[in-house]
Amino acid sequence: ASTADQRQLLMSDLQALGLFPLQAQLHFDCCELDLQRVAAEAKDCDAVLAAGGGKVLDAGKLLAHRLSLPCITVPLSASTCAGWTALSNIYSPQGAFEGDVALDRCPDLLVFDHGLVRQAPPRTLASGVADALAKWYEASVSSGDSSDGLVQQAVQMARVLRDQLLIDSLTALKDPDSEAWVRTAEACALTAGVIGGLGGARCRTVAAHAVHNGLTQLQACHHVLHG
């Protein structure tokens, strides 16, 4: 419901371009019940366009993967880097983490519209900052000594990302019209995803995500964002 206006605008824009979008909404988080229902509805579609938060983007990526369709992601917040990564997390209808699926590729196109993302509640950017900051601590602990060139590049990108967020994030949260907001939002939603793409599981196989996934089993934690 919180993104209804943006979704309606997107539908109108697509129709104005002569396209015939079929709209589908998730009843749960990225859940098998929703995925099976939407897959049946989308069997004659040419592509999957996912617009929303991280779980909507995860669902769109996984749906496109299963249907062998091109995938376009449109993040409506900077709360995670889900719009850029080749990974989807699956949850139960109750919101508990069940597992993740490694996809064969990243989305074919990511559209990061500052105007859309600015409409998201400030707490979503705060969540994105926390999620992106964690990339350095996860990557440096799990793969700081790796001899793999791409992994080392991911680790160093995570360090630069951390420094950028420590400089800009407070100003960004106070002033969404500032250049600091642009740098911070792009760092959270875009750069953090590149780190995940280069480093993969080797840059996140530490306690942080395991603790997060365990906490999703508790109903009392379901109002808390990923970051």
Regions found by a protein language model. Name each.
Residues 1-47:
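ATP/NTP phosphate-donor binding region
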Residues 54, 133, 209:
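Short, conserved catalytic/metal-binding motifs centered on acidic residues
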Residues 147-227:
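Active-site segments that bind and position negatively charged phosphate/pyrophosphate groups
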Residues 9, 13-17, 62-66, 214:
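Alpha-helical structural signal in soluble globular domains
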Residues 42-63, 67-78:
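A short, small-residue-rich loop immediately preceding and capping a beta-strand
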Residues 65-157:
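A glycine/threonine-rich phosphate-anchoring loop and its flanking beta-alpha core
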